From Swiss-Prot:
FMN binds at T142, E150. This is Riboflavin kinase. Catalyzes the CTP-dependent phosphorylation of riboflavin (vitamin B2) to form flavin mononucleotide (FMN). SUPFAM superfamilies: Riboflavin kinase-like.
Amino acid sequence: MEDDKLIVRIISKEGEIIRLTEEGERFLSSCLSSLKDAILSLHSIEIKGNIVSGLGEGKIFLSMEYYKSQINKIMGFDPFPGTLNIVIYDKASLENRLLLDSSPSLMVPEYKQKDRVLGAVKLYPAAINKLTPAAVVIPLRTTHPKSVIEIISPFHLREKLNLKDGDEVTIEVYV
């Protein structure tokens, strides 16, 4: 740092004093600003994929009062009873999907009923083809591979966006 003229070292009988130079103060201020932006800013991750038909399990779960009420409480909308399944087809989008696993999420907690356990679900606010509100739903217990994501919205997304199997969509996930 001394070679970069960011600090000045003063040696005396009492010891050593290290002071920031004006250039050092500017550099430190720039670092703090970058850290603040990184911590406080809303960032998004883009994921592209193609629409695929699901097995209808999303409809079953989103028809359950527990999930409906939790999603409304957390996301602020009543979800359409069904998810839109998207298969990720390119490397960059799959890498971005994997980033979600280590990104902070909103969470529907696990709920124990008498005869079953309703599993926890991660929620990420999102836009699909620029349409909001929407959310990426990642159940903690799922049969889907990482290359398939599910989207929820208050809208019937296939109708609202005129989508059919094979159509490409862009998901902007806010993390």
